[in-house]
Amino acid sequence: MQRFFSARSILGYAVKTRRRSFSSRSSSLLFDDTQLQFKESVSKFAQDNIAPHAERIDKTNSFPKDVNLWKLMGEFNLHGITAPEEYGGLGLGYLYHCIAMEEISRASGSVALSYGAHSNLCINQLVRNGTAAQKEKYLPKLISGEHVGALAMSEPNAGSDVVGMKCKAEKVDGGYILNGNKMWCTNGPSAETLVVYAKTDTKAGSKGITAFIIEKGMTGFSTAQKLDKLGMRGSDTCELVFENCFVPEENILDKEGKGVYVLMSGLDLERLVLAAGPLGIMQACLDNVLPYIRQREQFGRPVGEFQFIQGKVADMYTALQSSRSYVYSVARDCDNGKVDPKDCAGTILCAAERATQVALQAIQCLGGNGYINEYATGRLLRDAKLYEIGAGTSEIRRIVIGRELFKEE
C-alpha cells in the first residue's frame, strides 16, 4: 500500500477542508484507517472536481466541454481500482470500488453512472475474463481515462430476457460478422472499447451467446442518436447498430459460447458496486436537507426544530446507514472470496428503493423549494429512480433472491 502515499495518489490527496455533514468518521461504517482516508480523499476530489459541474451536466445533458472528467478521474487512479498494478490499476478490492462509486455519486449521479459502466462493467470484465494480450491492449488507456469503456447486453426487445437477444454473430474466416442492435448502452456514444454480447449459435440457448470486444471505428459499427433520459442526464446513453460488422477472432472475451458465463460471473459484482450509487444519492439528499432545515424558519423558528421534520431526517438517515452497512458488509465478503448472488442482488434492491424514497422525503422537507429545479432535490430523485431499473430491475432482483433462498436447504 505504500505507493498510495505519493503526491499523485489517492491517499496523498490532502483533505484540507471538510464540509459540515453527519458523514463523519463515526458514521462512516469503515473501521480501517486506510479505507477511511481513501473515502475522505475521494470525497474531496469529487466535491472539488465533479460536484461543481453537476447542475450544468443535468441541464445540458452533457459532460462539461472545458474539463475532461474521464482523464481527471484517471489521474486520480479511480478507473482501475480492481485492476492489477501492472496495467496502471490499484489492485484493490470491491469495498474500495464501492467507496469510490458512493462518493462520486454523492457529487453527481450521472458522472457516477458513467464511471460505474466504465470501471465496473467494462474494465472489471476485461480484468476478470480477458487474455494477457487483451489486457495489455485495452486496459492501460481505459484505466488512464484516455479511452472510455461500455458494456452492451440489452436490446429493444430483450431487456430482462437476456437469452432472447437477436444480435447475431456469424462465424467467418478469421472472425465473426455481427448484425443487430443493442439498446440503452451507457457511455455508448463516447466509448472506444465496448463489451458486447451476441448469439453465435441461435439454437443453443444460453450456451450460444458469446462476448466480444468491440472497438470504436470498426467497419459496420455505429451509434444512433443519444437518448433523452428523465434522469442521469449527461451520462450518455444510446442504441448501438451492427451492420455486417467484422470482429476478429482474437476479440472474443473468454471463449465462444461462454458469453452467459462471462455475464453471470460478473453480474453479482456489478450489482454490488452499482449498489453504492444509491448510497451517494442518499448522502447527497441529507447534504441538501440538513443545512436547509437549520436555516429555513416558519412560525419564528427553524423548521428542523419541528418533530415531524426530525422524524423525516431520522428516516432518511437510518435508510442510508442500514443500506450502507449492507453494501459494505457484502463487499467485504466478496473481497474474501464469498460472493453470494442473493446478497449482491439484495444490496442494490435495498439501496435503490430506499434512495428513491429518501429523495422524495428530501423534496418534502424543502417544501415548495424542493419542487423547484434551482434546488438539487428534483435531480436527485430523477437520478435515484434509474437504479430501480438499470442493471436488472427491482423485480428481477427479487426473483434472484427468492430463487436462491428456495434452493437453499
UniProtKB/Swiss-Prot annotation:
Enzyme Commission identifier(s): 1.3.8.4
Keywords from the named record: FAD, Flavoprotein, Mitochondrion, Oxidoreductase, Transit peptide
Location (main, coarse): mitochondrion
Organism superkingdom: Eukaryota
Pathway stated in the Swiss-Prot or TrEMBL entry: Amino-acid degradation; L-leucine degradation; (S)-3-hydroxy-3-methylglutaryl-CoA from 3-isovaleryl-CoA: step 1/3
Molecular functions (GO terms): 3-methylbutanoyl-CoA dehydrogenase activity; ATP binding; flavin adenine dinucleotide binding
Catalytic activity: 3-methylbutanoyl-CoA + oxidized [electron-transfer flavoprotein] + H(+) = 3-methylbut-2-enoyl-CoA + reduced [electron-transfer flavoprotein]
GO biological process, one term: branched-chain amino acid catabolic process
Coiled coil segments of this chain: none
Active site: E270
GO cellular component, one term: cytosol
Subunit-structure text: Homodimer.
Function per UniProt: Involved in degradation of the branched-chain amino acids, phytol and lysine for the supply of carbon and electrons to the ETF/ETFQO complex during dark-induced sugar starvation.
Family as reported in the entry's similarity comment: Belongs to the acyl-CoA dehydrogenase family.
Protein name: Isovaleryl-CoA dehydrogenase, mitochondrial
Species, as recorded: Arabidopsis thaliana (Mouse-ear cress)
